[in-house]
Amino acid sequence: AKAQRLKTLTEDVVEASKVSSGNINLQLMDVNLVEMMNQTTGEFAEKFEHKNLELIQTLPNEPAIIHVDGRRMWRVLENLYNNAAKYAMPGTRIYADLRTDKDEVIFSLKNVSEYPLNFSADELTERFIRGDISRSTEGSGLGLSIAKSLVQMQGGKLELYLDGDLFKATVRFRKADKKEQDSCFFRENSEE
């Protein structure tokens, strides 16, 4: 277990270093966020079940296509879901909501925190800053920082909201151009 934690920490530090230096080559493609969310939900089902967390997921009826790096976008969702799995109060609900409007795809994840959120939303995306009470949990303290940087690198926006013990993360991306869209999960764009 210690070896796995050390490996994860090392990977997070390397990833954070690459992101902050801008030393990442993005492989942009059209990604259907509906399918990616379903995959993420499947990956995290056991972790959520272990803490008796119920995931309430709301998805649009049509594909939600964004033009991003599929691997990096997966990392963003993984970090956000992992954050919820670690810090949500056991026995509560996690709400994952994906919607589209005319120009945007908007994803939000919210949960009730097991610990008091006695710091600002900005502090949550600073590297290594976590509340003292959460230091007993696994992790590098880099997850939200990495997620925010990866979203920005791909032209999106990640916003965090704290209200008492309620935590909410919202990710916004511009919809992919209509001519680029199809329902493939990872499709390389032929123009690149």
Each PLM stretch: what is its role?
Residues 21-26, 65-68:
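Conserved micro-motifs of the catalytic ATP-binding
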Residues 155-156:
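Conserved glycine-rich
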Residues 27-42:
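A conserved beta-strand-to-alpha-helix junction within the catalytic ATP-binding
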Residues 116-129, 185-186:
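Short conserved segment of the HATPase_c
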Residues 27-30, 49, 54-64:
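Conserved catalytic submotifs in the C-terminal HATPase_c
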Residues 84-85:
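Short helix-loop "hinge" at the ATP-lid/N-box region of the Bergerat-fold HATPase_c
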Residues 1-6:
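Short alpha-helical segment of the dimerization/phosphotransfer core of two-component systems
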